[in-house]
Amino acid sequence: MSMEFDAVIIGGGVSGCATFYTLSEYSSLKRVAIVEKCSKLAQISSSAKANSQTIHDGSIETNYTPEKAKKVRLSAYKTRQYALNKGLQNEVIFETQKMAIGVGDEECEFMKKRYESFKEIFVGLEEFDKQKIKELEPNVILGANGIDRHENIIGHGYRKDWSTMNFAKLSENFVEEALKLKPNNQVFLNFKVKKIEKRNDTYAVISEDAEEVYAKFVLVNAGSYALPLAQSMGYGLDLGCLPVAGSFYFVPDLLRGKVYTVQNPKLPFAAVHGDPDAVIKGKTRIGPTALTMPKLERNKCWLKGISLELLKMDLNRDVFKIAFDLMSDKEIRNYVFKNMVFELPIIGKRKFLKDAQKIIPTLSLEDLEYAHGFGEVRPQVLDRTKRKLELGEKKICTHKGITFNMTPSPGATSCLQNALVDSQEIAAYLGESFELERFYKDLSPEELEN
């Protein structure tokens, strides 16, 4: 079996698998490979346990500006449309209601203004008053002793929307389709990359077991590990990483759909939301919390999981200055300490209950169950030159046949949009063709028309 490929993708999560499919379906590349360190695809950030299983299209994510929502909506549409085109309903993609709510006069005023801006972007977006929310999500309004909660509440959202996705199963489908299209493609599991070497006009991707695969182009979609790999080759040395891990709590099946809350604009992390679990029936997840930790993967034991690569990246004056500046803000400081408390046994559950009751007021301590093994690290990039936290996705394009992607949320939602960008770059670099018009025709006709 030849180990030489046109392109090798490092990382078998949903982003890497989407590019594997896109190159196979729409480009003239003949052989593409994925190398993945786990024994199965999509076992880390793309696992159904690691994320909220949400297609983040911007309609109920209150931290998105209208400009960002317009872009994210188109990205989300591609991922949704792929699943519907392939007939993956109720296996990979699920239909449910969803809404964002404002609680209290200040948040309600914000939600009213937001609706006026966003109803033009999202066709069919509906505004919900307190009575309508009670009809759709009775447990959001029901207070103590069977009496409605006293706060003013309004929201907006959809009564039905293809809004829930199992990104692990989507990853598997991408790979299955890609292998049908190009049987010479290859997937290498249990291949933990140790280093990447440039050898003339080819890259050698070398595993810890001394296996080697070769490619003219390497795309690194390795989540938290992308930046350490880049820095090992001399790229991205002006960047650091703030790993933020999210945890969830299970509650009984008290919500009919997704319920999101208003996010503090100062905080780069999602506000607490409720999501009926698509995999574990009869359970609803409340979360995430946000805890910084010196690990590139969440669910490893503490000592084994501490990352030497992370320490190399972050043990410098610039990173400490960024951290100091962030912690100097009272709201951010209180948020960080509060989330540290959430992780403590016994007391953490008591403290989290108050946040969870913003969504379901009647929740009791007995209703909350810490979701062990759920949640994952999202690498937030620190720009050491600008001395600030960079929100969202980060790409290092070397223009030398290797690109590094760091894709925290909404990276899974945007997987096909990111795959489009990367596939076009790879095809152009290798002098191959890419059928952009057919891509848009299949997955985003709206962009083709415009």
Swiss-Prot record:
Pathway annotation: Carbohydrate metabolism; tricarboxylic acid cycle; oxaloacetate from (S)-malate (quinone route): step 1/1
Names of the cofactor(s): FAD
Main localization, broad class: membrane
One MF annotation (Gene Ontology) recorded for this entry: L-malate dehydrogenase (quinone) activity
Subcellular location, record wording: Cell membrane
The UniProt record lists the keyword Flavoprotein: yes
Topological type in the membrane: Peripheral membrane protein
Catalysis: reaction(s): (S)-malate + a quinone = a quinol + oxaloacetate
Cofactor note: The FAD is tightly bound.
Top-level taxon of origin: Bacteria
Keywords: Cell membrane, FAD, Flavoprotein, Membrane, Oxidoreductase, Tricarboxylic acid cycle
EC code: 1.1.5.4
GO biological process, one term: tricarboxylic acid cycle
One annotated Gene Ontology cellular component of this protein: cytoplasm
Free-text function comment from the UniProt entry: Catalyzes oxidation of malate to oxaloacetate in the citric acid cycle. Donates electrons to quinones of the electron transfer chain.
Family: Belongs to the MQO family.
Protein name as annotated: Malate:quinone oxidoreductase
Lineage, uppermost ranks: Bacteria, Pseudomonadati, Campylobacterota, Epsilonproteobacteria, Campylobacterales
Gene name of this polypeptide: mqo
